Swiss-Prot record:
The keyword Secreted applies. Residues 1-17 form the signal peptide. This is U2-lycotoxin-Ls1c. It comes from Lycosa singoriensis. One of its GO terms (molecular function) is toxin activity. One of its GO terms (cellular component) is extracellular region. Its main location: secreted. It is found in: Secreted. InterPro entries: Toxin_34. Belongs to the neurotoxin 04 (omega-agtx) family. 01 (type I omega-agtx) subfamily. Disulfide bonds join C51-C67, C58-C97, C60-C83, C69-C81. The keyword Signal applies. Expressed by the venom gland.
Amino acid sequence: MIKYVLISALLVVAVYSFTIEDSEDALLEEAEDELDTEEERRMALPPGAVCNGHKSDCQCFGAKYKCSCPFLWRFRRSAKCHCKKGWAWTAIKKRSCHNRYQWSG
C-alpha cells in the first residue's frame, strides 16, 4: 500500500514539474510576442513594400492590405513577399492588429 502511495506521489511531482516547465516556456513565448507587437506598432509598411511572410498581415499599412507571397516562396531565395491589396475578409482579420490606429480614420 505504501509503495502505491509513494509511486503516485512521484507521478504527481513529475507531472507538476513538467507543467511548471511548460508554463515558463509559455511566458517566454508571450514576452517574445509582445516584442513583435511593439515592432508592429512602430511601423507599418506601405503598399508594394517588401514584407516578411513569416509575420502577420499587420505589418502592411491599410485595412485591406496583406503580405502576399509567391507560390513556393520559401524554397526560392529570390522570391520576396510584398504588401498587396487583399479581399474584404483581410480587413476583418486585421481588426485585431495592434497598429490599426495608424490607418484607421
